[in-house]
Amino acid sequence: MASRSLGGLSGIRGGGGGGGKKSLSARNAAVERRNLITVCRFSVKTLIDRSCFETIDDSSPEFNNFAAILEQILSHRLKEISQSCRWLAHLQIPLQGQVTWFGYESPRSFWDYIRVACRKVSQNCICSIENMENVSSSRAKGRAWIRVALMEKHLSEYISTALRDFKTTRRFYEDGAIVLGEEANMLAGMLLGLNAIDFSFCLKGEGLDGSFPAVIDYTPYLKYIQSSDSISSDEEELRTLGSSGSESSTPENVGPPFLMDENSWFNKCKRVKQKYQLTLEQKGYLEELLRLRENQLSESVSQNKILLQRIEDSDLAHKLEKEQLEYIIVELQDQLTVLKNNDLRSRQELTAHLTNQWPSPGALDVNAVALDTLLYRKHNKQWYEKSYQSLDQLSAEVSLSQTSLDPGQSQEGDGKQDTLNVMSEGKEDTPSLLGLCGSLTSVASYKSLTSLKSNDYLASPTTEMTSPGLTPS
């Protein structure tokens, strides 16, 4: 910048007046850009400081000043509509105002640039602002967009997206604009701090009226510093002004300025005292708040200790209960194993007992058969006697009937009866002769004898046999 100024001055000295004007305009533009960015940074800082004490809304002077500064930045060196209306018509973007042969009647606003460059932002509010009924002018829509973006905490995102679309930015702005220079990156970074503030705006207020331009109040950001040389020069000027009225100047003539200085010092002292009292009150409030927070912290710490102790006790109780349950499980498993072994042993003993108690038929020897036969005789002796008596009676009846029918054969019958008695007296009492207990003339007795011989029947000692030949026919 300094080189450009020096170049401009040399051009002026050499007779080049056109180069000097260009360098001067460039320097003025640079100063304007730097001032706007600096004021915007101060405005953002004051907004953040104010948000710590109250909610930021339309009535806040800090916000109104910030909105005016941002509007001035976005409108800095904005091209006229007539220069780019053909390109916008090619993109099928609706424009505000009426078209004439010379361009648009209404002036260009930064909203025309924002709604084109920020359409790529996800979930943008462009369509919502376009459809607002109470906002008609392009400038009013731009102001509404600033408020909505601040409430959504997306203003920095909108500006960053618009600045990345360099082609669109070049079409809307002239050379030397803030959005085309290095200051644009600083602007996006400054606006990022506004995402921490909660804004509350009414989109139907007078602030959206686009009939008047935005005016920046630089007063809060100005600071006057008076040097020692300027103070002495002011006193000399006061003496000169006091002596101009009369030739004989006395110290009384300079009295009123000193009185004014005393009043000013008194006012300064009064303001300092007020600030001190205010600071003292704030200090007392902060100390009280600190004590309250310390009490809350101590209570929280004590409660935390109690809860930690409860958790430790619960963990210990759970561990003990777990150990007891594991011990019970092991004991039950041992008991189950013992019961299974006892059951298996009982089954084996029962099987062995049953096997010894009831041997297989092939394992029986001759002595066992004889013992079985003796036991059978003992238990069935009475039955044998009854059978023999019935056999004798039956034989007598048969012989009588034959004698009565054939007297010639009676003698033969007597002989047969004697033979039968002899045989009955000399027979062997064994189970093999049980089939002969019936009548020899009975067919059923003969069949039972045949079946007995064929099966080698051996009666059990505990079984009572009923021969079909013993039943009288």
UniProtKB/Swiss-Prot annotation:
Sites bearing Phosphoserine, chain numbering: S232, S233
Polar residues biased stretches: 399-422
Record's compositionally biased regions (Gly residues): 8-21
Coiled coil: 317-342
Listed PROSITE patterns: RUN
Modified residues (Omega-N-methylarginine): R13
Signal sequence segment: none
Name recorded for this polypeptide: RUN domain-containing protein 3B
Location of the region described as Disordered in the Swiss-Prot/TrEMBL record: 1-24, 399-428
Tissue distribution: Isoform 2 is expressed at high levels in brain, thymus, ovary, testis, leukocyte, liver, small intestine and prostate. Isoform 1 is expressed in the brain, testis and adrenal gland. It is activated in tumorigenic breast cancer cell lines and in the primary tumor of breast cancer patients. Activation also correlates with metastatic lymph node invasion and can be detected in metastatic epithelial cells from the lymph nodes and in the bone marrow of patients.
Gene from which this protein is expressed: RUNDC3B
UniProt entry keywords in alphabetical sequence: Coiled coil, Methylation, Phosphoprotein
Source domain of life: Eukaryota
Similarity section: Belongs to the RUNDC3 family.
Keyword Thylakoid: no
Residues annotated as domain RUN: 57-206
Organism: Homo sapiens (Human)
Pfam families: RUN (PF02759)
Listed InterPro entries: Run_dom, Run_dom_sf, RUN_RUNDC3B, RUNDC3A_B
Subunit structure: Interacts with RAP2A.
Disulfide bonds: none
PANTHER family assigned: RUN DOMAIN-CONTAINING 3 PROTEIN RUNDC3, RUN DOMAIN-CONTAINING PROTEIN 3B
